[in-house]
Amino acid sequence: MRPFCLGVLLAGGIAMVASVGLAQYAPAAAPYKVLKTAKVGGEGGFDYLFADAEARRLYMPRSGPMGQLTVFNMDTLEPVGAIADVRAGGAAVDPKSHHGFSTTKPITMWDSTTLKVVKTIDVEGRPDGIMFDPYNERVWILGHTPPYATVIDAKEGTVVGTLDLGGGAEQAVTDGRGKVYVNLSDIFNIAVVDAKNLTVTAHYDVSSKGYGFGSGLALDYKNHVLFAYYREPSAEVVIVNADNGNIITTLPTGVGVDTVVFNPATMEAISAENNGSMTFIKENSPTSFAVEQTLLTKSGAKTLALDTKTNHVLTMTADFAPAPANARK
């Protein structure tokens, strides 16, 4: 295996390249652009980023034998700490209890102020995605094998319950008022969940449009609009009425979307794509949408995080170093 280093990107609206990157919003006349890139280094795979806008911290979980949870100052992209032996795909923080969680197995719960591990929490399945729901201060652990969702009390660090969503859970969003929506990657629909009672109340089916392999999901909670991203047979976003599941329209995206976000400050749905692009979709009204910009980032930069304080978007990817001369092929 070739060694690689991670990087973060920043831009007038985006983050980019073999490091962590960040992008920043610009007026309509000026497109989004990459503002900054920062070399991260280190070993291990990577998946999701988590931005704690209030505490000004960016969390980057790393997997593999040398995996750890690396923490950065979100304004400078300088490292501020790490939690060793936390080999995870995703992380989330409850700003009220200052408890953080990462999708290790068992789940690791840590103090977001001190970065000290508080406890581990046994769960079933194969943890992957993660979401914090401020409605009732719970953390949702998502996976592609049953149980598809495990819900944890963020204050106590105890399992509240598990939920069979009917398919592999890719990304979840909350309206903050008692509803959670989950894009199911293998059955072509969106599960609607009562967050208080942990019951599935509806499935919004998009299979009639021929879409498969669901990935990212974003929500305009004010206007009740869902943005559900699909990779097959073509890369598109299906824009759905969150109240009844009716499809409003569809738009093209870049190839290989993973995580997405909706920025209510700019009324844009933003997706990071494995082919090295970031797509910005403008919501002109609850029934009118358009692809505003496709920004070139770097191959592999398929996940993102939004800094809601600055409207910066951060993404990351890996640069592969040349293999040593004596390396086995």
Task: Enumerate the predicted regions with their spans.
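Bacterial N-terminal signal peptides that target proteins for export
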Residues: 1-10
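Predominantly soluble domains enriched in secretory-pathway, periplasmic, or organellar proteins
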Residues: 11-329
